[in-house]
């Protein structure tokens, strides 16, 4: 059941026109995971929208967190010009051991790579929500968007990764996507190749997975008609185990592991 904390909600430009931002943060053992990274991204978006973040937001956040009677849950912070609100809910993503792998497919909706809003986590999520609903009705776990040039970008609520010959590949931010927190983590921990990718490239890769802050890393077993392996022996599974060990550490990581192959432990930091 979702729990809300509404603090004198005012119908400002955020709630009337979408000029607001939010962050969805997993809480693990009573602590928000990589809160600093989420707050940094939130501040960046609010600055772009011309919104000042309240000086006492952190006190409200911790008051809300400490008021919860459970250790593992999802915290959502919703911010606009005149509002700061929090909600909580359960994290419904299964553990890696119980994950059969996602089935994903291309959406008919295109990402507009020329829009600056696509790179920010704003209230403007209509395309993603509608595409997600349609995909689920068709038995698809996550729709994947191409941009106006036909390049792969991201999922409705996830970033997209591939593995080929032990190397990680992901579309660049310039393709028109939100730079996710787990995406940033992987790009700092491993020598990720960011390059334009097209639908015809999908079948050339060995593995595929999605990322976001709640799922961590989600293996993909089928992308359209292309099947990928899903097991505890894949490099995707090894990456997930590394993430599970790392998520209790501070973010960001200061060392980029050039040449580090997926699945190998990151050097001590």
Task: Please name every model-derived segment.
Residues 2-53, 59-66, 83-260, 266-269:
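Helix-start/capping segments and mature chain N-termini
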Residues 70-81, 85:
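Ordered, amphipathic secondary-structure segments that act as subunit-interaction surfaces
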């Amino acid at each position: 059941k979702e729990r809300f904390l509404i603090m004198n909600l005012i119908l400002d430009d955020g709630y009337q026109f979408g000029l607001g931002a939010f962050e969805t943060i997993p809480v693990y053992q009573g602590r928000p995971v990589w809160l600093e990274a989420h707050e940094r991204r939130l501040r960046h978006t609010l600055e772009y929208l011309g919104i000042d973040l309240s000086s006492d937001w952190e006190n409200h956040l911790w008051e809300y967190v400490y008021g919860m009677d459970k250790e593992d849950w999802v915290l959502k912070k919703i911010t606009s010009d005149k509002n700061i609100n929090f909600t909580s809910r359960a994290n419904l993503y299964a553990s890696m051991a119980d994950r059969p792998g996602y089935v994903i497919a291309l959406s008919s909706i295109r990402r507009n790579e020329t829009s600056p809003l696509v790179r920010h986590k704003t209230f403007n999520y209509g395309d993603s929500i509608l595409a997600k609903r349609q995909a689920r009705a068709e038995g698809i776990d996550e729709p994947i968007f191409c941009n106006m040039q036909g390049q792969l970008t991201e999922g409705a609520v996830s970033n997209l990764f591939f593995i080929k010959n032990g190397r990680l590949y992901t579309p660049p931010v310039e393709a028109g996507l939100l730079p996710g927190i787990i995406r940033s983590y992987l790009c700092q921990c491993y020598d990720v190749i960011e390059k334009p990718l097209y639908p015809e490239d999908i079948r050339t890769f060995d593995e595929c997975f999605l990322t976001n802050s709640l799922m961590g890393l989600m293996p993909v077993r089928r992308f359209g008609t292309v099947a990928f392996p899903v097991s505890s022996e894949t490099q995707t599974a090894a990456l997930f185990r590394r993430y599970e060990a790392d998520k209790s550490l501070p973010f960001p990581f200061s060392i980029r592991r050039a040449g580090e192959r997926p699945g190998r432990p990151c050097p001590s930091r």
